[in-house]
């Protein structure tokens, strides 16, 4: 891992230490939750039974969240051909694209897309929903719709149905997890706000890349 210049009383870099795995496991064990990306180390949070808040995920169907108390936000996908940000509904309807994203075999150039990171407001909003989460609260109707889209996509996708066991398939289908309410309001379906965001991003990309 390359070094980076960051100093804080709450930040400790143990990556160069001899017992870095031991330090990592201790940290997972003593932490209240995991906050980071959906890279492989996010799986350790599940092993230690810790809640997870994952940002900038591109695994729209299975973003390493398994319980209702786990939260995820996704990268935005700007389609260069259509000059817009794709809604989650549109991503799931494009089975090939969603599968390439899930398997991390995506090529932005060949797919004519640009992946855009979550901005500060999206991450802050996700953290707020994550910290205020309660099992007793009424569930979000949009979250139900997201999970139904995800399940429908998995059921019609050969990548999942060709797995060796029924248990494996059922595990993916029945995974639960939460997506921030405001994120779903903005990105689950095409709407006027998403059109405004698309126009703004398209304008910035045009200045930067002359698309």
Please place each PLM-identified region on the residue numbering.
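Residue-level detector of flexible, active-site-proximal loop/helix-junction positions
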Residues: 18, 59, 78
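A structural signal for well-ordered alpha-helical segments within the folded catalytic domains
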Residues: 22, 39, 43, 121-128
């Amino acid at each position: 891992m390359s070094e980076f210049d960051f100093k804080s009383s709450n930040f400790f870099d143990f990556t160069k230490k001899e017992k870095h795995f031991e330090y990592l496991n201790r940290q997972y064990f003593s932490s209240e939750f995991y906050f980071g990306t959906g890279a492989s180390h996010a799986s350790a949070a599940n092993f230690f039974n810790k809640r997870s808040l994952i940002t900038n995920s591109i695994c729209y169907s299975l973003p390493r969240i398994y319980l209702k108390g786990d939260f995820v936000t996704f990268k935005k996908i700007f389609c260069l051909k259509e000059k817009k940000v794709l809604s989650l509904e549109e991503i799931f309807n494009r089975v090939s694209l969603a599968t390439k994203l899930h398997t991390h075999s995506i090529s932005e150039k060949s797919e004519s897309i640009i992946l855009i990171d979550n901005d500060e407001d999206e991450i802050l909003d996700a953290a707020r929903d994550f910290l205020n989460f309660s099992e007793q609260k009424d569930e979000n109707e949009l979250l139900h719709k997201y999970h139904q889209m995800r399940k429908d996509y998995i059921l019609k996708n050969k990548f999942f149905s060709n797995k060796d066991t029924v248990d494996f398939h059922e595990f993916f289908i029945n995974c639960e997890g939460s997506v921030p309410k405001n994120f779903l309001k903005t990105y689950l379906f095409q709407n006027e706000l998403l059109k405004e965001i698309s126009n703004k991003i398209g304008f910035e990309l045009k200045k930067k890349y002359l698309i």
